[in-house]
């Protein structure tokens, strides 16, 4: 499952000073590729190219074809360091992907049917999201772009947990496997309803 392509060059000038010069003078981003029983490799990326890639949310949960000076590496984005004020990427970590080895990755949650949820449509409640992504473990071929959270049947006061999610075949939710059935979302009484109830009580 390779839908994204990124170009990189082997980096020989290492160190913090060299990294600063890359970002300042050449609009390039230092990065490292590791894992897969190979030595870590330092590379550089074009800032404009990786910024364009990251405009697509799916890039974070997809296998990426990284072309390094003519050689191809199949990787996942493992970590990004961003500028604290401006938000642009300052450094990237990529994990090599091996087809027959399980990997772990963070996958976004997509909440559906929120406007027709029982607790919203019938009881006037509001939905709160506790988490926006989950860590999964699977083979590279099974890595999902996202996992859906169907809110249609969720009632007022009800909490949706990891155990309520339907993970695709071959995909394991890491926290759930470790016994942590985290809350994902809930429907609670809206502030307007609460305030109206308080006013009515005071009037009586």
From Swiss-Prot:
MF annotations from Gene Ontology: 5S rRNA binding; structural constituent of ribosome
UniProt-listed GO biological process terms: translation
Top-level taxon of origin: Bacteria
Q: SUPFAM superfamilies under this entry?
A: Ribosomal protein L25-like (SSF50715)
On whether Ribosomal protein is a keyword of this UniProt record, the answer is yes
Record keyword Repeat present: no
The record's Gene Ontology cellular component field reads: cytosolic large ribosomal subunit
List keywords of the entry alphabetically.
Ribonucleoprotein, Ribosomal protein, RNA-binding, rRNA-binding
Gene3D superfamilies recorded: Ribosomal protein L25, beta domain (2.170.120.20), Ribosomal Protein L25, Chain P (2.40.240.10)
The record ties this protein, via Pfam families, to:
Ribosomal_L25p, Ribosomal_TL5_C
**Stored CDD domains:** Ribosomal_L25_TL5_CTC
Subunit note: Part of the 50S ribosomal subunit; part of the 5S rRNA/L5/L18/L25 subcomplex. Contacts the 5S rRNA. Binds to the 5S rRNA independently of L5 and L18.
Name the family the entry cites: Belongs to the bacterial ribosomal protein bL25 family. CTC subfamily.
* HAMAP family named in the record: Ribosomal_bL25_CTC
The function of this protein is: This is one of the proteins that binds to the 5S RNA in the ribosome where it forms part of the central protuberance.
Protein's recorded name: Large ribosomal subunit protein bL25
What species was this sequence derived from? Pseudomonas paraeruginosa (strain DSM 24068 / PA7) (Pseudomonas aeruginosa (strain PA7))
């Amino acid at each position: 499952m390779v839908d994204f392509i990124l170009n990189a060059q082997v980096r020989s000038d290492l160190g913090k000073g060299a990294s600063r010069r890359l970002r300042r003078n050449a609009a390039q981003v230092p990065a490292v590729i590791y894992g897969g029983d190979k030595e870590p490799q330092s590379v550089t990326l074009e800032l404009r190219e990786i910024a364009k890639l990251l405009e697509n949310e799916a890039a974070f949960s997809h296998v990426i074809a990284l072309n390094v000076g003519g050689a191809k590496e199949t990787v996942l984005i493992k970590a990004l360091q961003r500028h604290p004020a401006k938000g642009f990427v300052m450094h990237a970590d990529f994990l090599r992907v091996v087809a027959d080895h399980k990997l772990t990755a963070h996958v976004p949650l997509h909440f559906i049917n929120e406007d027709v949820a029982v607790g919203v449509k019938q009881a006037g409640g509001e939905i709160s999201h506790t988490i926006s992504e989950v860590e999964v473990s699977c083979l590279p071929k099974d890595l999902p772009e996202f996992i859906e959270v169907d809110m249609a049947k969720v009632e007022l006061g009800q909490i949706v947990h990891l155990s309520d999610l339907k993970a695709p075949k071959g995909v394991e939710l890491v926290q759930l496997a470790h016994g942590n059935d985290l809350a994902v979302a809930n429907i609670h009484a809206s502030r307007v309803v609460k305030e109206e109830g308080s006013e009515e009580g005071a009037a009586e």
